[in-house]
Curated annotation (Swiss-Prot):
One of its GO terms (biological process) is photosynthetic electron transport in photosystem II. PANTHER family: PHOTOSYSTEM II D2 PROTEIN, PHOTOSYSTEM II PROTEIN D1. This is Photosystem II protein D1. [CaMn4O5] cluster binds at D171, E190, H333, E334, D343, A345. A quinone binds at H216, S265, F266. Belongs to the reaction center PufL/M/PsbA/D family.
Amino acid sequence: MTTIQQQRSSLLKGWPQFCEWVTSTNNRIYVGWFGVLMIPCLLAATTCFIVAFIAAPPVDIDGIREPVAGSFMYGNNIISGAVVPSSNAIGLHFYPIWEAATLDEWLYNGGPYQLVIFHFLIGISAYMGRQWELSYRLGMRPWICVAYSAPVSAAFAVFLVYPFGQGSFSDGMPLGISGTFNFMFVFQAEHNILMHPFHMAGVAGMFGGALFSAMHGSLVTSSLIRETTGLDSQNYGYKFGQEEETYNIVAAHGYFGRLIFQYASFNNSRSLHFFLASWPVICVWLTSMGICTMAFNLNGFNFNQSVVDTSGKVVPTWGDVLNRANLGMEVMHERNAHNFPLDLAAAESTSVALVAPAIG
């Protein structure tokens, strides 16, 4: 009994030091308890992604025995390469290595995709928790991790919620450049995302956030308080940790208020920076919500043949042009799976030409 207690005490001897090291804010890079989970998960996801991108064999993504190659060793380059999503034959089943009869079978059915995305999602969630943990240790407010939740929600939407809604991980976003574009085209074809208000909010958030960031940076740079001569860079006029303002917010406020109008300019630095953070974050949240609703086929607005003249004849609009483009993309994707688009099969045929050409 004494021997067992001595062994246990020797095993736990370094535990307090380990806890202190994990939670110490004096480390060059903060680890934290969330970091204990984050580091192995992101390492596993990154390692599997790199190996699969270089050497993974083709994957039967559609479940029809027609494998799609995505790795360098099978003829792809950095643009066309991808980690191909797991097979439609697997569906939503959890598919770790031990569920396959052989490693070749696991690779053929796209097992690396699930390994990467599951470890990646756990890793970025732990990274978000680590941001909160470090803020808590330093006595800061928790808004950094709240802002980071926007891209995290987007990742969960395309890698987890959308496959759940569509019934198969084969519908998830491929892990590559061309695969991402293919995912976007197919998403537009099947869900008309461009006509969804939440996607429009996301576009406003991205372009608006870039505009506001450029406006703020240029205003601050243009109203710096000169502390140097003309021979030195103005950057030398700032000392890290100085208490004085480094730019004149009154001058920036006055300039922008006269450029647009008075109330278009913030006179409070704190509310200004809250707006700069909240605008893109809220809009990306909305976009993620839109992806999650479209995952269950609550799609964007449909304005097909919505304008008619007094005789009931359809007056074509850009909505009809968009619909025709959607149909074209839909019939082209998964062209060997022989899944005829339901909206083409169910609706009346749309004439391409108004008058049949004369023969002879």
